[in-house]
């Protein structure tokens, strides 16, 4: 058994999976970011206006970054009513890619902010192929601090080092 495990480890080491190239510019349906408050504070006090504003700010940051990299953001108005009924497009059994394909996009981009506490937040982005539904790039980063600056840095890091990471 030890020999089999050692052989498998050697095989995997000798034949690494090739790194996937960053996605090429195309048409992207960005469904914005969703804020999910899992904290006790949220359960007791409800939605905080500064976090709603911060979610919009971070969505704009992601959209601007995509455009700066040569992507075309397709209008999502034709699916807006359906999108309103979806709690979280990041986790909807492929509804994001189905809507992106319907909109004529090459990619579906979704993201979320999970607030664990006022100190710990988890930021996530997912870029999927609209036709196949395959996840092309996805990443999560935990940040410390619930400020505009920590959110900006977190999403900038995700875009630069995960979604558009070079080999």
Where are these regions (language model features)?
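N-terminal signal peptide c-region/cleavage motif recognized by signal peptidases
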Residues: 14-16
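Bacterial N-terminal signal peptides that target proteins for export
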Residues: 1-5
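Short catalytic/metal-binding and nucleic-acid-binding patches
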Residues: 8
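C-terminal/domain-edge helix-coil "capping" segments
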Residues: 20-40, 57-61, 68-70, 97-102, ...
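Second-shell loop/turn segments in exported
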Residues: 42-53, 85-86
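N-terminal, post-signal-peptide region of Sec/Tat-exported proteins
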Residues: 48-78
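Short, solvent-exposed, polar/charged sequence segments at loop or secondary-structure edges
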Residues: 67-110
């Amino acid at each position: 058994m030890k020999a089999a495990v050692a052989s498998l480890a050697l095989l995997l080491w000798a034949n690494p999976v090739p790194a996937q190239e960053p996605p090429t510019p195309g048409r992207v349906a960005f469904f914005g970011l969703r804020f999910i408050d899992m904290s006790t504070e949220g359960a007791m006090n409800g939605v905080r206006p500064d976090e709603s504003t911060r979610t919009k700010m971070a969505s704009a940051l992601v959209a601007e970054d995509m455009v700066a990299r040569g992507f075309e953001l397709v209008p999502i108005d034709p699916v807006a009513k359906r999108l309103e009924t979806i709690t979280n497009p990041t986790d909807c059994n492929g509804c994001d890619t189905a809507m992106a394909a319907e909109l004529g996009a090459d990619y579906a981009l979704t993201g979320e902010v999970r607030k664990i506490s006022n100190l710990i937040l988890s930021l996530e982005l997912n870029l999927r192929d609209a036709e196949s539904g395959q996840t092309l790039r996805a990443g999560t980063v935990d940040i410390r601090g619930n400020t505009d600056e920590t959110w900006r840095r977190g999403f900038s890091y995700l875009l630069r080092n995960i979604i558009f990471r070079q080999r």
